């Protein structure tokens, strides 16, 4: 670990670096570190390694401010509870969603959280590939994601659309969360072989 402290006027500027090798946390350990409301997820288990850069200021009254955090994460395994009703588009969706072999960049600054990443995901019975960007500003949550579905089903009843069993479907979603259990899909695009569908809501 590295730690640097600079004094300017009546404030201390503190910055540091910290590398973590393979950390495993269960649900209770995670709750002791990060508020569930901040993450917006009910995480059951996580295994990861990370490179962390952080900085913050401390005033003469020992009040912390301007906290910034940059993390590069190698996520081996993440399991969280599926709290969203997505069975109408992912017919075989699981009660627990699993992320494996993810490369993630996380940035936290002034109550704003952004996460970008890519890797494997078990939404249904087989592995799919996923890329994503998550933005959380106070009570607002946005998700932009690309999901490549190969051996899993996908359906859109509204358009009477069903994925071909032997083809690869590229699904792009722009989603906003309005409360803990409700998602609004702003844009959905599908690409399967020569078929393309774009839906803006």
Regions found by a protein language model. Give the residues of each.
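Membrane-proximal interfacial segments on either side of biological membranes
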Residues: 1-201
